A protein has these predicted regions:
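PLP-dependent class I/II
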Residues: 3-500
Length: 500
């Protein structure tokens, strides 16, 4: 439909008094706000909304020729690598293009393995609410390889519309009893990405924060888990423990020892373990490697390997794929009570299946080109380039941030973000309060206004009270990361001077 012209007027116009009366009646009779779910009303307003609104205005002003100290915005709030200079993987885009437009398979310009994969995928589009049957098998084979032979079973895997949808809609919907008193609780890391916190609240549950130890590289301490659990007494009934490994926004990568401690804690306290592992491709720290919770659980042996209930998540949006728009992911269930698993699959089955193109992208993630395939040399070259680029970005970012006065950045061992602490001057904190903002939101708004760089404030992520942080994406091209750091250095120096 074409948009209405700006001069459009309705054919029948009501007198202004009648309009006012009608509007008043709609408010009083319908009581819209009173009818909205209290769980939805309890969702904390995002700090990012202030920044997003202003960024939208700035983009409009730039397009209208308004003069500013910069020509365009640089949005490094989110992990969307293809929007910040990282090229998509050729193999992935070629196969998806051939699936969408099969005529391309008649062209010999596409490598043979691309055409064969597209043909194979198109021949298996039979649907199914838990995903294409073959896709669950492919994911199962992938996790078995990844975990050093720890067996995986297709019947314990379902395909989802992204990892966040799977965690918050499919899994927590089963775990959370919205009518319980006290309400259901979920232990969540702090800092933690805001979508998880909002979703937990929307379901009528309580997020119980456990604070990662920033001074020790954002490590997860079992003593802190115990403190968080005790703090929930009389407030809620914790049933699940949510972990993010590698971290977001904090860039920790858990060691085997740390994961074993978490598993023992979950076992002792009878907590359902939710492992968000979407950044498993991105590990940079020395002597660090990604090991899945499923693998560590299996290696611990009985009784843990037989009893701890675990759900793990992965996504095509993250890692080398970076296909954020596909919204494809998977969930693997381990040791679930058959009665619980039945309800999870019942909930999934009531929904339409994940978009077929997203499922195809998932196949390309878990089953990439192998040595000897025509597409392998280029695929290997591109993924290696991304690895090297990110390693350099991490090194450069760490050096620059820690050279700035009043900034401390812990080493980034994995994930897609850097989350430095900013020690803001008292005058800046006072000014932020006068303007009705959190101090680090105020900092980010000023950064946006003066440099065109869009970062997220730490207050978006449940940081420890009295501390201030910013988060920005490092899964960008080296040129963009350097540009962000250049702007940030200039801005921060001036900001600290202005408010000293």
């Amino acid at each position: 439909l074409s948009p209405m012209p700006s001069t459009y007027t309705p054919r029948v116009q009501l007198p202004s008094a009648q309009i006012a009366s009608t509007q008043l009646r709609e408010v009083t009779d319908m009581s819209v706000l009173q009818e909205i779910s209290p769980n939805v009303k309890n969702i904390k307003q995002s700090e990012y909304e202030v920044l997003a609104s202003r960024a939208s205005q700035i983009e409009k002003e730039l397009s209208q020729g308004v003069r500013k100290p910069y020509k365009e915005l640089i949005d490094v709030c989110w992990c969307d690598p293809h929007s910040v200079g990282v090229k998509p993987l050729t193999f992935v885009r070629q196969v998806l293009a051939a699936c969408v437009y099969p005529q391309l398979m008649k062209s010999h310009e596409l490598p043979l393995d691309v055409r064969q994969r597209a043909q194979w995928l198109l021949g298996r589009c039979d649907g199914g609410s838990v995903g294409m049957g073959c896709m669950c098998v492919k994911v199962s084979e992938f996790t078995t390889r990844r975990d050093g032979g720890v067996p995986s079973y297709p019947e314990n895997i379902f395909i989802s519309t992204g990892s966040q949808w799977a965690i918050m809609v499919d899994i927590l919907n089963v775990l959370v009893n919205s009518e319980a008193s006290p309400k259901t609780g979920v232990l969540t890391p702090a800092p933690c990405h805001v979508t998880s916190m909002m979703s937990i609240t929307a379901l009528g549950a309580a997020a119980v924060p456990y604070y990662l130890t920033e001074e020790q590289g954002w490590t997860l301490q079992v003593e802190e888990l115990q403190r968080a659990l005790e703090s929930a007494k009389g407030v809620c009934n914790p049933v699940a423990l949510y972990v993010i490994n590698p971290g977001n926004p904090a860039g920790l990568v858990q060691s085997r020892k740390s994961m074993q401690e978490v598993i023992r804690f979950a076992s002792e306290k009878r907590l359902f373990l939710l492992a968000d592992e979407v950044y498993q491709d991105f590990v940079y720290g020395e002597n660090r490697e990604f090991v899945s919770y499923k693998r560590v659980l299996a290696e611990m042996g009985p009784p843990y390997s037989d009893t701890v209930e675990l759900v793990s998540f992965h996504s095509t949006s993250k890692g080398f794929m970076g296909e954020c728009g596909m919204r494809g992911g998977y969930v693997e269930l381990v040791n679930l009570d058959p009665a619980v698993q039945k309800h999870i699959f019942k909930l999934i089955s009531k929904s339409s299946c994940t978009p077929v193109l997203a499922q195809m992208a998932l196949d390309l993630m878990v089953n990439p080109p192998q040595p000897g395939d025509p597409s392998y040399p280029l695929y290997n070259q591109q993924t290696q380039h991304i690895k090297n680029m990110l390693a350099q970005n991490v090194k450069t970012t760490h050096e620059v941030l820690n050279s700035l006065p009043g900034v401390i950045s812990q080493p980034v061992e994995g994930g897609a973000f850097v989350f430095p602490r900013v020690f803001l001057p008292p005058k800046a904190i006072q000014k932020a309060e006068e303007e009705g903002m959190q101090p680090d939101t105020f900092y980010c708004v000023r950064l946006l206004e003066e440099t065109g760089v869009l970062c997220c404030p730490g207050s978006e992520f449940e940081q420890k009270e009295g501390t201030y942080h910013i988060r920005f994406c490092i899964t960008a091209s080296q040129d963009i990361v350097k540009e962000v750091l250049r702007h940030l250095t200039t801005f921060h120096t001036k900001f600290m001077k202005d408010f000293s």
